[in-house]
Swiss-Prot record:
Region Flexible loop, residue ranges: 100-110
Subcellular location: Cytoplasm
Cofactor note: Binds 2 divalent ions per subunit.
Catalysed reaction equations from the record: L-methionine + ATP + H2O = S-adenosyl-L-methionine + phosphate + diphosphate
Gene Ontology MF, one: magnesium ion binding
Main localization of the protein described in the UniProt heading: cytoplasm
Record-listed Mg(2+) binding positions: 18
Gene name linked to the record: metK
Residues that bind ATP: 16, 167-169, 238-239, 247, 253-254, 270, 274
Protein name: S-adenosylmethionine synthase
Length: 393
């Protein structure tokens, strides 16, 4: 990539229909884990106007009222009025869960290559990433896109901007100079709103636009980056119909929002609704943990980790480190350090990050990475000093 360029990432609010689905799936996972943390869970959710469908595969000894969990999640998000697209009190909730396939279970429970470990729940490749663009070691565009959505929800829920409704999207286009963030070129923010905020069917009231810029955008974004920044606020001119009424929502459709905003590759596997025996989720968390500790150790300015697995096999097919020329030691030496200091077998990951806990609903909006939440063990940098010493730095 050239040293001077524009790069864009987007986020969506907790009220976006796909994120509603993600949060329901992870709320169900958490409810199960509170009773039986050894459960196997693959909980998928569909949301539409007045309708929620719960399907997937669950093997558990827990007794969970899935319908109530779904309603409680929708209520927490703020869909408490049919005018918003779905109402937690009156929506229909259909439940269609099966048990995990015995063919899959035998490979997960008894790894073919390691009698002391569980096997990977599926084949696949996962990526982790970290860089020094923000204190949280995340790419700046996705980090600030998330913060805009958090701010929108905060002002909606505390009543400071009472005309806001749950569904929203943000997009941040960053200008890079000499490979580093220099300024924000464009901010797009579209938010669902009450009908009285439209001046015409194709134009928002000036007071609405001003409130979004002054109350949501400017308090979040660094002032030094707002140099001739362009603001596009509800550019269609109206966003009254939203949430599951505006679009059908499905679990797992916001995988780039969930990760790094396109700053690194994605293996394709979604996270929400999956217990940590599914390496789509747990190995992606572990790869972030590894990459973040390498950058925190000062061994690279940016670091990408790829891991890959075969179903029923515990040991990864590969663990590859790529620092795009920013490493202070070679990528091969960094890969050797990763093999030495991180156990990336599924059970090793679960133990290393303490993943058999009901911690997942919180991950399902505003990104799984780059957030200072006490439950997010993959965000710790507790191995940075160890890596630095092992590298002789």
């Amino acid at each position: 990539m050239a040293n001077d360029f524009l790069f864009t990432s987007e986020s969506v609010s907790e009220g976006h229909p796909d994120k509603v689905a993600d949060q329901i799936s992870d709320a169900i996972l958490d409810a199960i884990f509170k009773q039986d943390p050894r459960s196997r869970v693959a909980a998928e959710t569909l949301t539409n106007t007045g309708l929620v469908v719960l399907a997937g595969e669950i093997t558990t000894n827990a007794h969970v009222d899935y319908i109530q969990v779904a309603r409680d999640t929708i209520k927490r998000i703020g869909y408490d009025n049919t005018e918003y697209g779905i109402d937690y009190k009156g929506c229909a909730v259909l439940v269609a869960y099966d048990k995990q396939s015995n063919d899959i279970a035998q490979g997960v429970d008894h790894a073919s290559d390691d009698h002391l470990n569980i096997g990977a729940g599926d084949q696949g490749l996962m990526f982790g990433y970290a860089c020094d663009e923000t204190p949280e070691l995340m790419p700046a565009p996705i980090y600030y896109a998330h913060r805009l959505m958090e701010r929108q929800a905060q002002l909606r829920k505390d009543g400071r901007l009472p005309f806001l409704r749950p569904d929203a999207k943000s997009q941040v286009t960053m200008r890079y100079v000499n490979g580093k963030p220099h300024s924000i070129d464009t901010v797009v923010l579209s938010t669902q709103h009450s009908p009285d905020q439209s001046e015409t069917p194709h134009k928002m009231k000036a007071s609405f636009t001003e409130a979004i810029i002054e109350e949501i955008i400017k308090p979040v974004l660094p002032k030094e980056w707002l140099k001739e920044t362009k603001y596009l606020i509800n550019p269609t001119g109206r966003f009254v119909i939203g949430g599951p009424q505006g679009d059908c929502g499905l679990t797992g459709r916001k995988i780039i929002v969930d990760t790094y905003g396109g700053a690194c590759p994605h293996g394709g596997g979604a996270f929400s609704g999956k217990d940590p025996s599914k390496v789509d989720r747990s190995a992606a968390y572990a790869a972030r943990y590894v990459a973040k500790n390498i950058v925190a150790a000062g061994l690279a300015r940016q670091c990408q980790i790829q891991v890959a697995y075969a179903i029923g096999v515990a040991r990864p097919m590969n663990v590859t480190v790529y620092t795009e020329g920013t490493g202070v030691i070679s990528d091969e030496k960094l890969s050797a350090l990763v093999h030495e200091h991180f156990d990336l077998r599924p059970k090793g990951i679960i133990q290393m990050l303490d993943l058999l806990r009901p911690i997942y609903e919180k991950t399902a909006a505003y990104g799984h990475f780059g957030r200072d939440e006490p439950e997010f063990s993959w965000e710790r940098t507790d191995r940075a000093a160890l890596l630095r010493a092992a590298a002789g730095r």
